[in-house]
Amino acid sequence: MASEVLALLDLKGTERVLDVGCGNGKTTAEIAARLPQGSVVGVDASADMIAFAVNHEAVHPNLQFAVADARELLYQDEFDLVVSFNALHWIPQQDLALRSIHRVLKRDSLAQLRLVPKGERKSLEDVLEETRLCPRWAGYFRSFRDPYLHLTPEQYGILAERNGFKVAATRVAAKSWDFQSQSAFLAFGSVTFVEWTRHLPQGERLAFATDVLDRYRQVACDAPGEENFFRFYQIDVTLSRR
């Protein structure tokens, strides 16, 4: 995945780059290695992720990491490029995130964003929402708000234009991962479902995840042997700051 997203970047080596939702910092460090006369800042809302990145990936003098909310970035007209890879779909208040990204970019600079859009196929997040509303689980989620963004590529483009960007390019692809076993798929779920499972007692979390994946197989399994396939759409959007 890292090689895919890095291939999207046309770097001269002198840019100042911001990586929004940098996670463990690995991709951010690879960007830093391509900027011999530039620099990159990786930000993430998770203090734990930033601590990991600082301890494991801060190996370049032109690389910094900081805890920051994508909706409230504390920069102004500073970056030549903003990138974000599979992070922004976890921010339902996307207007705020896009406005924030627009503010930190220099005029006529670019944002290269990769996220998971809504598509024709029912998503894993759609199934999570259906599952938590069923009678067995609904009582645990009375105050719950869906943490996921559900926009089609077309809707995302309109949203970006509304927040001061011009859509320079959009690419959509259907992706699939084969986890090959239920245990591996459940391990993935234990991380991916955390915004839902944190509302459950510890003893119910495995049952909830199993219920979700059983329901998901009904919409994602197209043929025998595909019981542990995760299918999703990926959108790469290039935005120009006006």
Predicted segments, located by residue:
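Conserved alpha-helix/loop element of class I SAM-dependent methyltransferases that forms part
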Residues: 1-15, 30
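A structural alpha-helix within SAM-dependent methyltransferase catalytic domains
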Residues: 6, 29-32, 98-102, 129
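Class I SAM-dependent methyltransferase SAM/SAH-binding core
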Residues: 16-20, 24-72
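Conserved class I S-adenosyl-L-methionine
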Residues: 110-137
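A short acidic, Gly/Pro-enriched loop at the edge of an enzyme's catalytic core
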Residues: 71-82
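A short glycine-rich, Lys/Arg-flanked "PGG" loop and its adjoining helix->strand segment in the class I
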Residues: 95-110
